[in-house]
Amino acid sequence: MYQVKGKWALITGAARGIGYLTAKFMAEQGCNLILHSRNLSHTEKVLAEVRSLGISAHAVAADLSDLSAVEAMLREIDSLGVDVDIVLNNAGLQIAYRTDYCATPAEDYEISFRVNTIAPAMICYHFLPKMISRGTGRILNTTSGIALDVCQAGYSASKAALDKITIDLGSKVEGTDVLINLTDPGWCRTDLGGSQAPNAPESAIPGIVTGVFVNDGKSGRYLGAQHFAGMTLEDAVKKAEAEFDSPYGK
């Protein structure tokens, strides 16, 4: 199992929901954290909580729909002088449900792709060469089970594009200890998922981070969190390595 104690991880969208739970879990494993949100005030609570667990942590802020803000955030992270060995691209934006799908505005696609595809891709491209140079690293991109839903076409298309980027990048790190995979929390009762969702946010732990801990050299696969609900981290990793092959397959 990949060891994260003392390593540094970037978690986007860490202030609430799945990102918040992910930050707490990773801190419990001894992982140092860089926590992203749109505003530094949003991460004050989680920053204090993870630091209380004895790890080092920093907060950064950026509007992921603004490429210049993403680039500024990456420069700020570089200025910290730490090696980011783990990237969890958790942040996402879900657009309105368009019952009249033929009236879907172009803006749905524009904002969805900026936040859900372009920003995580830029983050991947920034850190992946550094990981390859050091010979180790993990990138986990959060996708969605929403597919073939024309009423949420902008969102589903942006996640499908992220899936493709992840698979393609995975082929470039074959044979190394740098792994890049996909995760999906499932439909959870968060601000994004809504109150009607069937799954508690806590059900996504530890599955949402299983792709960080797998250590079998396989990239480009889908490791949906609900497949590992109720398991220990060790059992989740064993299941992932035994049952989930590459490339991507749900």
Predicted regions span which residues?
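Conserved glycine-rich Rossmann-like NAD(P)H-binding loop of the short-chain dehydrogenase/reductase
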Residues: 29-45
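Conserved glycine-rich cofactor-binding loop
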Residues: 8, 15-17, 39
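Catalytic Tyr-X3-Lys loop
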Residues: 102-121, 136, 140, 162
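Conserved mid-core segment of classical short-chain dehydrogenase/reductases
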Residues: 71, 92-110
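The beta1-alpha1 cofactor-binding region of Rossmann-like NAD(H)/NADP(H)-dependent oxidoreductases
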Residues: 40-41, 60-73, 106
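Amphipathic alpha-helical dimer-interface segment in Rossmann-like NAD(P)H-dependent oxidoreductases
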Residues: 115-133, 171
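Catalytic loop of short-chain dehydrogenase/reductase
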Residues: 93-94, 106, 125, 138-161, ...
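C-terminal helical subdomain
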Residues: 175-176, 182-183, 190-242, 246-248
